[in-house]
């Protein structure tokens, strides 16, 4: 959606994705096919965990702004495959920061996560709340991203903005997200698992 909107307003958009198999790759391909209808959209397959590959692309293209939404997502999967999170969310994010530093970009916008709030019980959530107690490796990597971005902003003057997304849903959404799981269960006349004994409430 971000790439599509930027291309529509006239920006040249260069997309990077490793097209991993965390969820159905055909959905990712379909998204790309849709984006390729935009004249100003370019795509190259790349793993951000590979610094040399990412650096080569950045030196060739000379971007002026970076919107970093690539990451290994999913709280539960971080228990099953922790190394994927270190490679993508820690090493990959460091590689993005280094490329931004070398390019002297005007702004880095990156995806953090609401999961950083962890055991914080204060409601409603606030950007100034303590987020020092993540309860998953995924959340810990996102907290680390915020600290890394702050450090690079301080050291090298890179303007950075981190966005703590909550459950993202809508067209082209990930099939492992709650709205998609619920919708599929309803369509197939299956039960929907409710956690916390049904005692949850809106923030």
Task: List the predicted regions and their residue ranges.
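N-terminal Rossmann-like NAD(P)+-binding domain of SDR-like oxidoreductases, especially those catalyzing
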Residues: 1-168
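Short strand-connecting beta-turns/loops that link adjacent beta-strands
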Residues: 8, 187-188
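Conserved catalytic core of Hanks-type protein kinase domains
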Residues: 69, 185-186
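Glycine/proline-rich active-site loop of Rossmann-fold NAD(P)-dependent oxidoreductases
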Residues: 143, 158-161, 168-181, 188-190, ...
């Amino acid at each position: 959606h971000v790439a599509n909107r930027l291309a529509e307003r006239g920006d040249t958009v260069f997309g990077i994705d490793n097209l991993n198999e965390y969820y159905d790759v055909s959905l990712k391909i379909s998204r790309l096919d849709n984006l390729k209808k935009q004249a100003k959209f370019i795509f190259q397959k790349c793993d951000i965990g590979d610094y040399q590959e990412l650096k080569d692309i950045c030196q060739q293209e000379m971007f002026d702004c970076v919107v970093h939404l690539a990451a290994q997502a999913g709280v539960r999967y971080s228990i099953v495959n922790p190394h994927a999170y270190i490679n993508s969310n820690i090493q990959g994010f460091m590689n993005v920061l280094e490329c931004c530093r070398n390019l002297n970009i005007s702004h880095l916008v990156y995806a953090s996560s609401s999961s950083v709030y962890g055991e914080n019980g204060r409601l409603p959530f606030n950007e100034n709340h303590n987020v020092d107690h993540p309860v998953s490796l995924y959340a810990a990597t996102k907290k680390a991203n915020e600290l890394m971005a702050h450090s690079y902003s301080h050291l090298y003057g890179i303007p950075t903005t981190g966005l703590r997304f909550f459950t993202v849903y809508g067209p082209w959404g990930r099939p492992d997200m709650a709205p998609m799981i619920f919708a599929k269960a309803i369509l197939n006349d299956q039960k929907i698992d409710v956690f916390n004994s049904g005692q949850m409430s809106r923030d």
